[in-house]
Regions:
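Helix-rich C-terminal "cap"/substrate-channel and partner-interaction subdomain
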Residues: 282-386, 453-456, 460, 467-478
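Glycine-rich loop(s) and the adjacent beta-strand/alpha-helix scaffold that form part
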Residues: 110-117, 129, 156-232, 278, ...
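Conserved redox-cofactor binding core of oxidoreductases
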Residues: 9-159, 227-228, 341, 348-379
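An anion/pyrophosphate-binding glycine-rich loop and adjacent beta-alpha core
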Residues: 63-93, 204-336
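C-terminal structured subdomain/cap of oxidoreductase catalytic cores
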Residues: 159-164, 306-310, 396-464
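Short, solvent-exposed loop/turn and secondary-structure capping segments
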Residues: 33, 40-43, 179-183, 434
Length: 478
């Protein structure tokens, strides 16, 4: 499935792109002990060392740009979160909350940013050091040109500006904040997003001037999550939903019938079943869904930004002294929920999950409680019991995007590259990936195809000017 040429470009040129960026000053480090999603089942998978994450970056180096760069809202975290922890530290948050709190305070005092916020801060700093013009509050309105792209018109506080350019690279993200596009391509409604509110599908609008072709992948291959809303928190004028990876013990996720429908500790197993449609009954059997946990969970682990010792905000959860009472409050089938919890508890006491193999994957174990024999399993036996209704949460990876060539060239309806127009990241269809998903995929393809698109654009300009090729650094590896 997908494009063999694009896949080969990603695999064969990926390390070259990373080496180039490291050479310019991008700080990256492997995450020790963090297994591939599908290890050991997938051929070639590894126990650790394949994931790279940004090194903490001091925002004080950004000067005026420190206030202009986005800081994450902590939506990607299950326990403590924010932009003050690395992924490696997040996996230890459940077992060392005091140490993690000290680390966060220390980072905040030094003005350091981690994860995506740290990556962006580092890249902006690299660009600023080299005199790259970066315009804020300057939306791209339309492209310039007829047979080829010759620039674009951008908006601004006072007037529109006409910018001439030999090439334009669309890196606008997907369309999470466009309800029409989400419904058209993802076939769902009421989806919240971890992305900034500016992600509205501008790439489709801009590229339509040149009859650009779109391509799609299976929605089940996208990074679709479920999340929780903490009352009072908002993002872009909408309720903020924090992504949940329910890898800790003493909790389950159930549908309205009270049944589990996936391995809660490995979100890719339920990211498809949560969105599955039953053609016979003409409904979504696993939606709505609830996060159900007991007092042991509440006393041991944080929920979003809520520490174990803090009460849940009013209206966030249903609370009851029995499973049956909880089901009645939440609107869940009481007999079904009681049967599910009873079976789950009996199996969890033995450290197994014969229904969905929860706790059997090394990747999932890394998000659990390493103090327990099975880091992902523990019974729900301590009242009171809690139920939080979940929301659908997108992460910016979309089923549809612009069709591109192996160097990011936008392809038109006649299957020809549009001269001077490129699309990368989530603006480009994931035709090099097929229907699989792995963390870091969006950033990885953005970095690699951004590098390849820029080189291609520069090489064409160079050839047109000098009539000679640009040498490529094909032998660089990391």
């Amino acid at each position: 499935m997908g494009s063999v040429e694009n896949r080969r470009a990603y695999v064969e040129r990926g390390s070259e792109a990373i080496a180039y960026l490291i050479g310019l000053g991008l700080g990256l480090s492997p995450i020790d002990g963090f297994a591939d999603y599908y290890f050991p089942d997938a051929p070639g998978s590894k126990a650790d060392g394949r994931y790279l994450e940004p090194l903490p970056f001091p925002a004080t180096l950004l000067g005026a740009w420190a206030e202009r760069t986005t800081v994450g809202q902590g939506t990607m975290t299950t326990q403590h979160g924010g932009s003050l922890l690395t992924n490696a530290e997040l996996t230890r948050a459940a077992v060392d909350p005091d140490g993690i709190a000290r680390r966060k305070a220390d980072r905040a005092g030094r003005g350091e940013r981690c994860m995506g916020s740290g990556l962006i801060a580092n890249l902006v700093h690299m660009a600023a050091e080299r005199g790259v013009d970066m315009w804020t509050a300057s939306p791209a309105l339309r492209l310039i040109g007829e047979d080829r792209v010759e620039g674009l018109i951008v908006g601004g506080p006072d007037r529109e500006r006409r910018v001439r350019a030999d090439a334009v690279i669309l890196a606008t993200g997907a369309y999470d904040w466009s309800p029409e596009l989400v419904e058209a391509h993802e076939f769902i409604r009421d989806m919240y997003s971890l992305t900034p509110p500016t992600i509205t599908g501008d790439h489709f609008r801009l590229a339509s001037q040149f009859r650009a072709k779109t391509a799609t992948t299976l929605p089940q291959g996208c990074s679709r999550h479920v999340g929780i809303h903490i009352p009072g928190e908002s993002w872009g004028g909408r309720p903020l939903y924090r992504m949940m990876i329910m890898g800790l013990p003493h909790c389950v996720m159930v549908n309205a019938e009270g049944r589990r429908f996936g391995d809660e500790s490995f979100f890719h197993t339920y990211s498809s079943t949560a969105y599955a449609f039953d053609g016979h009954r003409q409904r979504f059997p696993n939606w709505p869904a609830w996060f159900v946990f007991d007092q042991t969970y509440k006393s041991k682990y944080s929920i979003g930004t809520i520490a174990p010792e803090d009460p849940l905000p009013e209206g966030m959860a249903m609370v009851a002294d029995s499973i049956e009472e909880l089901a009645a409050l939440a609107g869940i089938d009481a007999a079904g929920l009681a049967a599910t919890i009873g079976r789950f508890n009996a199996n969890a006491a033995e450290g197994v999950d014969p229904d969905f193999a929860r706790g059997s994957k090394p990747w999932s174990n890394g998000w659990g409680d390493s103090r327990l024999p099975n880091p992902n399993l523990g019974p729900l036996t301590a009242p009171p019991y809690y139920a939080i209704r979940l929301g659908r949460v997108g992460t910016g990876l979309a089923s549809a995007g612009l069709k591109t060539g192996a160097a990011g060239q936008v392809i038109d309806m006649a299957d020809r590259a549009v001269p001077g127009l490129y699309a990368i990241g989530n603006a480009a269809a994931r035709i090099e990936m097929g229907c699989g998903y792995n963390s870091g995929m969006a950033i990885g393809r953005s970095l690699v195809f951004g590098y390849l698109a820029a080189r291609d654009a520069v090489s064409i300009r160079f050839v047109e000017a000098r009539r000679e090729p640009v040498p490529m650094a094909r032998d660089i590896r990391v």
